Amino acid sequence: MDPNCSCAAGGSCTCAGSCKCKDCRCTSCKKSCCSCCPAGCARCAQGCICKGASDKCSCCA
């Protein structure tokens, strides 16, 4: 569990734009969990690797 997030990994949570999770794995999280992921990335919470400061990452390219 992310110490900055009150939800269990892979569970549902109330994360929104104000989510402070640094490594959120919530399936219901609507926030872009990676700084490079677009908000609509459905696989964001499955653990992506960012490729620099662009909008591309390993799961949302």
From Swiss-Prot:
Keywords: Acetylation, Metal-binding, Metal-thiolate cluster. A divalent metal cation 1 binds at residues 5, 7, 21, 24. Metallothioneins have a high content of cysteine residues that bind various heavy metals; these proteins are transcriptionally regulated by both heavy metals and glucocorticoids. Gene3D superfamilies: Metallothionein Isoform II. A divalent metal cation 4 binds at residues 33-34, 44, 48. A divalent metal cation 6 binds at residues 37, 41, 44, 60. The modification N-acetylmethionine is found at residue 1. PANTHER family: METALLOTHIONEIN, METALLOTHIONEIN-2B. One of its GO terms (molecular function) is zinc ion binding. Belongs to the metallothionein superfamily. Type 1 family. A divalent metal cation 5 binds at residues 34, 36-37, 50. GO terms for cellular component: cytoplasm; nucleus. The gene is MT2B. This is Metallothionein-2B. Residues 30-61 are annotated as: Alpha. GO terms for biological process: cellular response to cadmium ion; cellular response to copper ion; cellular response to zinc ion; detoxification of copper ion; intracellular zinc ion homeostasis; negative regulation of growth. SUPFAM superfamilies: Metallothionein. Monomer. Class I metallothioneins contain 2 metal-binding domains: four divalent ions are chelated within cluster A of the alpha domain and are coordinated via cysteinyl thiolate bridges to 11 cysteine ligands. Cluster B, the corresponding region within the beta domain, can ligate three divalent ions to 9 cysteines. The keyword Metal-binding applies. Residues 1-29 are annotated as: Beta. InterPro entries: Metalthion_dom_sf, Metalthion_dom_sf_vert, Metalthion_vert, Metalthion_vert_metal_BS. It holds the Pfam family Metallothio. Transmembrane segments: none annotated. A divalent metal cation 7 binds at residues 50, 57, 59-60. A divalent metal cation 3 binds at residues 15, 19, 24, 29. A divalent metal cation 2 binds at residues 7, 13, 15, 26.
